[in-house]
Amino acid sequence: MNISSMLSNDSNTASQDVGGNFDDSQRNNDKGGSQDANSKKMGTGEAEDHANGNASVEGNGIANHGSATNGNTKGTDDSSNVNIVESIIPKPIRPTRSSIESDEEDVGKNYNSIISNDSEHISQRYLENFEDKVNAINKIDQVLIKGNNMRVLNQEEENLNILIRNSGEIAENYIDRVVTEDISSKANILNGKDSVGKEFKWGSTRDMKKRELELEVDNASKADTAAKKGGNKSKQGATKSTPAKKAKAKPKRKPSATDDTSEESQLGKKRKTRAGSVSGASQNDEKSANGKVKLKLTLKDQAEEDSASADAASKVTTKEQKIITKQYDNTFVSIWKDLSRKDGPKVSRLMQQSTQAKMINLKKTSILAAREAKRWQLKNNRNQKDLTTKARRAMREMFNFWKRNERIERELRKKHEKEILDKAKKEEEERESKRQSRKLNFLITQTELYSHFIGKKIKTDEFEGTDSDPNANFKSANHHYDKYSNIDGEGKDFNSIDFDNEDEESLNKAAAVNAQIALEAAKTKAQAFDNDPLKNPDTNGEEMNFQNPTLLGDINISQPDLLKCTLKEYQVKGLNWLANLYEQGINGILADEMGLGKTVQSISVLAYLAETHNIWGPFLVVTPASTLHNWQQEISRFVPEFKVIPYWGNAKDRKVLRKFWDRKNFRYGKDAPFHVLVTSYQLVVADAAYFQKMKWQYMILDEAQAIKSSQSSRWKSLLSFSCRNRLLLTGTPIQNSMQELWALLHFIMPSLFDSHDEFSDWFSKDIESHAQSNTELNEQQLRRLHVILKPFMLRRIKKNVQSELGDKLEIDVFCDLTHRQKKYYQMLTSQISIMDLLDSANNSSDDSAQSLMNLVMQFRKVCNHPDLFERADVKSSFAFGRFAETSSFLRETNELEMSYSTENLIKYNMPRIVYEEILQPTFDNDVGSRKKINNMFNIYHPSNIANDELENFSWLRFVDQSPQEMNNLSKQNIIERAINNREYSDINYERINRLKYTYDEDNESFLPNSKLLLINELQNNHALISNSTYLKELYSIKKKVYEDMVINNMKPAAEPLVKAPPVAVVCDNISFVHDLQDSLFDPKIRSSLMPLPFNRELELLKSSIPITEYPKSNMLPNAINKFIDYSNIRMPSMNRFITESGKLSKLDELLVDLRQNDHRVLIYFQMTKMMDLMEEYLTYRQHKYIRLDGSSKLDDRRDLVHDWQTKPEIFVFLLSTRAGGLGINLTAADTVIFYDSDWNPTIDSQAMDRAHRLGQTRQVTVYRLLTRGTIEERMRDRAKQKEQVQQVVMEGKSAIANKEESGNKKKDVAFLLLGNDDSSAAALNDDSEEKQNLQDSKKSQAKNLEDMYHEGEGEFSGNVTPSL
């Protein structure tokens, strides 16, 4: 084993020495393999080897050291220690390699010369540093103690060296044999003997070696004797002979790497403890002394041998020397020949194999050594790294500890400071809350006083009287405000009042003063508007006063004479209320329930102003586009004296209309160019710049929900108009939230209701939360809200003011999803998740809202009809051909006969010569003669039949056929034979006779030719089965059974992709055209196959020809079954179209019952595409209908409404909820069906009131189709919630929560999509805080979704603004 890897950390010098010696030992392995083995054997029994004289100094030195360490021998000489040191410490010059090279160059040189050459390279420094090397050996011993873990590697290396040594024995034995023979021959010659040495066979050289060793011992003893004579010379010779003897032993046995390794291995095994090491050293000292004696004996023998050799050499003559030389050369050549021819290649291969094996093992050894070295290094690095990691961890934990300690102290300090601040803040909040409460109470009291003062003047309570809602659960209790009626004082600024120190009485007085000032300011503003002089220089103050008389106080008026209709009692009260508002300069909201005549009341107040105060305008009426014509017609009908300008149309038309009020020096009297201008919300915003120039006497906004948003440009534009009074007409002032009510109130009284935040703090939050979660509502707060609203708003309900108006019955019709709808619904549900919906709901971006709205619309489509996603289209083969065309059907007669005119696009041009020379009979072909031959040789020719009538054709008489008829049958094809055999019976033809009962059949003028013969037909009374309908069916049940068979209901398995007529054959010859036409379209066959023409049948009936004498017709065979016919066009099944939608199936049943009971129906839709599908259904069921949606023009809307009201044969009116739900009168209908409901329940209420309004005498039934267990059912719950808000605010009703509804929170749109499943509820009810946040997000998201749903639509005027 290479020990350098073991000594790398302790002694670099020693490591290098060991490595160098190891390399030399490996190189010397070629010549010393056999000698190593012998030396090792000699080392195991040292005494015997010395007795025989076979041991060398160097070989025994290493072997004896190994045996001494094992305890097998008694002692050794000093050369063992020298050899151990030499095997470890490197030599400056390596004599081993030089001796090997000299042996290879000349094997026959003198042995003594080889020893002398090796001795010259011995370094003298070695002897001088001997003691230092011993110390190095002791250090190495200490290192070897640490190398016990490398024993396995040492064993492997030892096995490798043994293998290399055994492989090199063959070559060493051969070389030793040759050298021994040569030396023996030379010795015999020198001693005067004739023998040339003992001849040996190939193989072992043990005997020769033994003899040579004996000679060497003798020579060494002789040399010792000669050395004693020399005195001092012998002493120096003994000193110098030590390396000489050492060199002499090298040719016989050279130390190999295996021996070194073996000795090192044995040394490592022995020196396991320090005590063992010390004992081994003592034994080595003992053996060292014995070694010196042997060294001296060997030097003596060699000296004697040298002297004897010199004497013998002097006696040899020149001739003998040549003979010896020649003999030596011949022997040397023969030896090398045998060596090169036989053993050279074999030894070379063995050397290569041994070298390769040695290199492989050395690589393995180096890898293992490197691994072990890295393992030690890795262990040290890991320990160092662990130490660093532990230090960092300790530092980090210490830092975290102090940081946590500081944080805890800081938090405690902040907590203490926060407690102090919270306490101070709480006290401040209590003071501020008390201050704000007093502020809020001051504002509400001021508003109440203002309303109280106005109410006393315009007497709203008296006008409402018993017409108000009896469900209102409170009465006015503000009589204590009367003491502030005549209070005087200066108004106080709201910000200058000290709410902390002022008492309640002083605050009430200040509020009363401010209310009086506000009331006077409103009245003064109205007077200023009336007294504003016109820009006409011809007028004066008196004329102005005549036109605008002084406003009166409390008035009581009757119906104006200008009004050409009779007002009902509650309408007269409404007129008085409006007149008092005008007199006080106060704006108002006429919020009567829909259908109570808000339009005629507003027209009556205009008539009152014109008749009583001579105020003829200008009046501005702004209304949805769908009611423009209605307003114009009613104003012209009720007040014919009013001149009405219908301000709509394109830009050019409106420019012409603006000339009526764009005049200077203009006075509004009875003779003015116009009095009332009627326009739409869209146009008033588009032309706002022109309307702002005018000072309008009275502005009426119909369907005031259109300005429900205070942020819209429409609201801001209308608010900027200069008007003396504003009147808002609405049946539903609150649709979704209290903010809409504030928008209307601020519009009529901007100074009083100037802050939406304050109004929200007053009322909105509590009322809306009460409607959503059924919380307790503050009755006092609700009472104060009604006190504020009462002076500005007049509302009556139908059942209290119109006893003759029929009831309204609302019915929710629940439908189930069909199989196809369920599949679509489940597919949509599986593609959404709770978390995604909540993320979208909390996200305020437009994209998330749009995605949510798209999901909602997809679910609603599934509920309506699955064909909204994918229609079952018409299927047809590709028609490859050309069809006939006509320029105009108007040019055709009433009886249009369509002949066969289809042509194939592919044409075959037949040469004319082919037709004329081949197909036509000429002198050049045999066509004519062939026809004649066929006719002559026809066995059915009449002449043949007549000649053979009694024999072969005797059967003709039994079939009632003549020879000529037989001849004709033989020439006919199968179709012609079927036509001739067709017979008619009376009962069969009655079914297909279209004019059977049209004309009288008494005319018997027709007489068939057969009657002219003197042959009477057999008459009997036997009944014919064919003439009886029922007997015929009973006689043969084949058709009845076939109708119920599966084959009759089977659809075609495949359809042709392409259909085309036959390829057309074209020839430039008129005769060919006629022949082709006769062949393909034989008139007789064609008339028999096709039905009888109408004109021809009419002529036959007029001539009273019996049915049995009719010409043959309608003989085309019937189709295989009811699904397969002669056409490849497949229309989708309408029955399947109806049954695939749960709503449509229910509607189909409902319409049948309604039609039987003479009802007329309004059907409202949200989707125009669903209206398209409904038109197909109504056409299939043959229900007469008309349609109105957002795309209908104004003129068309007027005509449609007129047709519905005047034509009772129209059964169904299809309307869009947004376009047909406002302003139009459809009282001719008594049934309303909502196919799908609107997000806003108020829109649906307005739509159903198109039928349930003034003038309706029958009960109105409202059906609402809802799909069970879907998004529509939950949308209906939210609609009821919104209706609850309206009832609380407008009618004073307190919501009574159902037990079931109280446990179910109203979900937002995300819950509308997912439903009330357990997983969604569990995900949102984990803690109360998250639940509250989700409720807030649901409110905001629901609002965003509703805005998106109606985005792009005109407010209450349809999905698309109509073209004007």
Curated annotation (Swiss-Prot):
Localization, UniProt: Nucleus
Bias kind Basic residues: ranges: 243-255
The organism's place on the tree of life at top rank: Eukaryota
GO biological process terms, semicolon-separated: CENP-A containing chromatin assembly; DNA repair; positive regulation of transcription by RNA polymerase II; regulation of TOR signaling; subtelomeric heterochromatin formation; telomere maintenance via recombination; transcription by RNA polymerase II
Protein keywords: Activator, ATP-binding, Coiled coil, DNA damage, DNA repair, DNA-binding, Hydrolase, Nucleotide-binding, Nucleus, Transcription, Transcription regulation
Signal peptide: none
Motif DEAQ box, chain ranges: 702-705
Single GO MF annotation: ATP binding
Annotated stretches, region: Disordered: 1-84, 213-293, 1321-1364
Binding positions (ATP): 592-599
Primary location class: nucleus
Pfam family, one: Helicase_C
Catalytic activities: ATP + H2O = ADP + phosphate + H(+)
Domain Helicase C-terminal: 1146-1302
Domain Helicase ATP-binding: 579-751
EC number(s) stated in the UniProt entry for this protein: 3.6.4.-
Cellular-component GO terms for this entry: chromosome, centromeric region; chromosome, telomeric region; Ino80 complex
Chain ranges of the DBINO domain: 335-460
InterPro entries: DBINO, DEXQc_INO80, Helicase_ATP-bd, Helicase_C-like, INO80/SWR1_helicase, P-loop_NTPase, SNF2-like_sf, SNF2/RAD54-like_C
Basic and acidic residues: bias regions: 213-227, 1330-1353
Family: Belongs to the SNF2/RAD54 helicase family.
Function description: ATPase component of the INO80 complex which remodels chromatin by shifting nucleosomes and is involved in DNA repair.
Subunit structure as annotated in this protein's UniProt entry: Component of the INO80 chromatin-remodeling complex.
Protein name per its UniProtKB record: Chromatin-remodeling ATPase INO80
Species whose genome carries this gene: Debaryomyces hansenii (strain ATCC 36239 / CBS 767 / BCRC 21394 / JCM 1990 / NBRC 0083 / IGC 2968) (Yeast)
Organism lineage: Eukaryota, Fungi, Dikarya, Ascomycota, Saccharomycotina
